[in-house]
Amino acid sequence: VTGGLQAFVVNVSTAIRPQIVQSYAIGNYTRTINLMYSLSKASICFLYIVAYPIMLEIDYVLKLWLGANVPDFAADFILIVICITFLNNLNSAVSAVVHASGIMRNYQIVGSLINLVSIPVAYYALSLGHHPTSVFWISFVFTLFMQMASLFILKGIIKFSFLSYAKRVLFPFALLILASFSLPLIPFFLLPCGFMRFLIVSAIAVLGSSAVFYFISLNHSEKLIVNSFVAKILRIKK
């Protein structure tokens, strides 16, 4: 499930990452940071658009996919992993700038250490008899640490403001969630579980969140990027 969602987001980021490398290479650091903001926002917002209906209907999706043989805690595992994927998508834009700079030592060392430390912590949690989902929550926390550490490392490479990052990336994402999450809940709670409810919930969630994303979360330059991306897809299909 998460692999399919991530594949969709990768197609979006592919259009922006080369521009980040090019901007950094010619010394246009302002454009580099602006592209990083845009890629971070686009990555998590596009993931939300396709992931939210799946998160709502995860029990039905698993039943449709696996039949009666749904493993214990599978739904919980997937929901937590999707949350981890949101953080990873935030980090992918930061990673693009770090790789464009070529100054990767600290980034790689810190990332490796954080991933390494999470393993014994998860093992210790299980040895104490904690719920199996605790392993994934621990992974979520360490992924969050990695995202925070990545931003501090990036600040040592290129000048940017944490406040600007919050305003350009996190605030529009929070606005998208607040403005779009409630409408799909109406058919979700009113209709019986089944394929028809899944279609209606998915349609409302995707269309509603897409509209909010385009008209509220994006600035003018980002709308031009999205328009260009959509036009390119339409030309390919023709």
Per-range role (PLM):
Residues 3, 38, 51, 60, ...:
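Residue-level recognition of pore/gate-forming positions within transmembrane alpha-helices
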Residues 156, 160-166, 184-238:
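Membrane-proximal transmembrane or re-entrant/amphipathic helices at the cytosolic face
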Residues 37-45, 79-82, 109, 137, ...:
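Internal alpha-helical transmembrane segments of multi-pass membrane proteins, especially GPCRs
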Residues 82-114, 129, 158:
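Membrane-interface junctions at transmembrane-helix termini in multi-pass inner-membrane proteins
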Residues 9, 33-89, 116-124, 177-178, ...:
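Alpha-helical transmembrane segments of multi-pass membrane transport and lipid-handling proteins
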Residues 2-40, 95-100:
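Helix-loop junctions and terminal segments of transmembrane helices
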